[in-house]
From Swiss-Prot:
NCBIfam families from the UniProt entry: PABP-1234 (TIGR01628)
Source superkingdom: Eukaryota
Family annotation (CDD domains): RRM1_I_PABPs, RRM2_I_PABPs, RRM3_I_PABPs, RRM4_I_PABPs
Residue ranges constituting the PABC domain according to the UniProt record: 523-600
Ranges for domain RRM: 11-89, 99-175, 191-268, 294-370
UniProt KW keywords: Cytoplasm, Differentiation, Oogenesis, Repeat, RNA-binding
Compartments where found: Cytoplasm
Native source organism of the sequence: Mus musculus (Mouse)
Name of protein: Polyadenylate-binding protein 1-like
Summary of the tissues where the protein is detected: Expressed in ovary and testis.
Record Pfam families: MLLE (PF00658), RRM_1 (PF00076)
One annotated GO molecular function: poly(A) binding
GO cellular component: cytoplasm
UniProt function note: Poly(A)-binding protein involved in oocyte maturation and early embryo development. It is required for cytosolic mRNA polyadenylation and translational activation of maternally stored mRNA in oocytes.
Amino acid sequence: MDTGGHGCSLSSLYVGDLHPDVTESMLYEMFSPIGNILSIRVCRDVATRRSLGYAYINFQQPADAERALDTMNFEVIKGQPIRIMWSHRDPGLRKSGMGNIFIKNLENSIDNKALYDTFSTFGSILSSKVVYNEHGSRGFGFVHFETHEAAQKAINTMNGMLLNDRKVFVGHFKSRQKREAELGARALGFTNIYVKNLHANVDEQRLQDLFSQFGNMQSVKVMRDSNGQSRGFGFVNFEKHEEAQKAVDHMNGKEVSGQLLYVGRAQKRAERQSELKRRFEQMKQERQNRYQGVNLYVKNLDDSINDERLKEVFSTYGVITSAKVMTESSHSKGFGFVCFSSPEEATKAVTEMNGRIVGTKPLYVALAQRKEERKAILTNQYRRRPSHPVLSSFQQPTSYLLPAVPQSTAQAVYYSSGSITPMQPDPRWTAQPHGPPSTCPPAASVVQPLSTTQHPCIHLRGASQVSSQVPHTQRVVNIGTQTTGPGGEGSSIPGQLLVPHRGTSAVHSAHGVQESAVYVPGHQPLTVSMLAAAPLHEQKQMIGERLYSLIHDACAPLTGKITGMLLELDNLELLLLLESPESLHAKIEEAVAVLQVHREMESTDRN
């Protein structure tokens, strides 16, 4: 097959319709018997790191790639047939639509393979696909031929033919923009109108009498249920667009039998859904723009604070348009929102109120973010964390480190008294300027050995002082690596996948892919997938047990209070703290400072 002239790589394949849990390792095991593989990459979402459902495989020899295309297409992986085609580096062919045809009214049993087999007689096929949703086939699909002539031949032969006793439509593919333009043109010349809010006694004859004054009608229909009762709406189809438009202008909002009619252009369900979705997105965007920079998120609220008290606390900084404490069964959930009239007022409130104690707790105040934005930020923080511990010159390694090659999947995270380049989460507590200095020295970029005469809140036990060791014997396979991130999914990056020999103690996910793990003495290794699999109420407990052990060694007198304060953070931020002793050290300092300020304020109030 001559693929080079069409922008295809002679040895690169596109593999689509992948199950979300399919990894590079699985694809390597499946395709490696065909021939030598240079690289495999599963494409993933930038924010969530979840599979997008397709991958690219580069073979060393073009003949191996062609053999894989011929023999492995529609093979089943994890209960789902895959779809293979040549990888097109130039998107022009796909976007032009040349040779691409659209087939609709397909019978439900026709799948990708059946569609491919049916149309392969007309020419070489680049790809074929039946569109599915959660309920099964949607009844239409696409076949992309290598040439326009083959596509035209398929249309001339198959359009109007029976496939599995169902007459199908076959035509040239049209882009969404072109279809919407044609739909808009048809909408301007509509003749069919929709009449809603009809009284139960209005039948076809009554409806015809109401609209006959506007012109000649082709059909009139009142929709009824299975019992023959009116469903309260119907359709009137005129011969001319002008007549239909006149009927809409005069009858919309008119009272008939005590009810106000709605009269408008009749729309198909897909068109109505598309318009409603567009309106919803427009309203959502307008709402986000309206509250951008003026809506504040307030966390760690005392249980005694209600809407009025929250508004009173923040009212000194400007005009508040709304203040709401989120509740569940009339009990405060510990957080709320305050919306100001201008961004300047909101910024001032964040600056002055973040870290201030209201009631018995220090507040966390920040600009409100949508859940998707917050998750994306935390995901990027997690991805930018150091790939391996950096040991300082004064410390000898207390565990085996993996070889110096890209090894994201096999990397376990260890604590030590040496330095780990910190990944600082956003601070949640800020001591007031008039408060006393912290008894804990500020965290530096390199953690130095600490003497036993210093404050008991500044010595973090090294979590690498555990017996679990990761062997350094690895077999290197030259395919893409998996970097495990939040949610247990990995990001595909060029490099080498490290496959450990049998008998290693590295932590594995449910799919056999190694994951980053947090080791704390006295506890099992903790991975992101283990955390995600646990119920919500157990996730905080799993993290809290490990935090308590580390905080107890650093600041025993205040262990319980500091642990409780840190558990107010999101789980992903807590994982960042567990992986970086410097970040945890900084958080402990902040918590101690806040508690000291609170203690002094209580002492002042008593005096």
